[in-house]
Amino acid sequence: TETWTPRFFYYGSRYLQVETSGHDAGVALQIVELTSKFVHSSAETVGTFTCANPLVNRIHELIDTAIKSNWQSVLTDCPHRERLGWLEEYHLNGPSLRYEFDLAQLFAKGMADMADGQLANGLVPDIAPEYTVFKDGFRDSPEWGSAYVLVPWQQYQWTGDLELIRRRYDGMKRYVGYLGSRATDHIVSHG
C-alpha cells in the first residue's frame, strides 16, 4: 500500500488521468482508491444564501465552490493555470464575497504581499507576490494596482476597522503619487 499527497502544489481540474510506471512489466498495478482533496483558505463563513428554486441554489453552490477553489494564500483568477495573485480579484470581487465570508485575515495577508512588492517609485505591480515580473500593462495597470488603496477602504466600510488603512497609509499615498506622476492633466490613461 502506498499513499501520496503533494505538499506544495495544488491543481484545479474537473477530470484526472492517472498513469503508472516503475512496476514490473506484465504485472498489473492495482489501484484500490483515488481520492481528491478540496483545499482552500479557511475564511470563516459569515453569511449564506438559499431560495425556493433548487436550480438557483445549485448554481450558487457551484459558484461558491469555484470561489473557494481560487483561495489559497492569495486570490487567484483561475485554479488550473498560473495561479498568480492578480490584484483586481481583491477589490472587484471583495465586496460581494464579504456577504458570505470573513476575509479580514486573507485580505490583510494580500495587503502585506502588495506592500512587499511595492517599488521604490510607488508602483504596485499587478500581481502579489510578484513571482513573475511582467512588462508594461501586465505589470503596471491602475485597475489592478488600485487594490492597494481600495482594499483597506473596503475593509473599513464593511467592518469599521481602520487598521489596514493605518498600517498601509504611507504606501497608499506613494501609490497615488505614482499614479499622479503618470497622469496627463490629472488623468491616468495608461494600463
Name each region found by the language model.
Residues 186-191:
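Flexible glycine/proline-rich, aromatic-decorated loop/lid segments
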Residues 16-21, 88-118, 149-165, 172:
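Alpha-helical support elements that line or immediately flank enzyme active sites
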Residues 178:
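Structured mid-domain segments that build the active-site/substrate or prosthetic-cofactor binding neighborhood
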Residues 1-80, 88-89, 105-108, 121, ...:
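Extracellular/oxidizing-compartment recognition motifs
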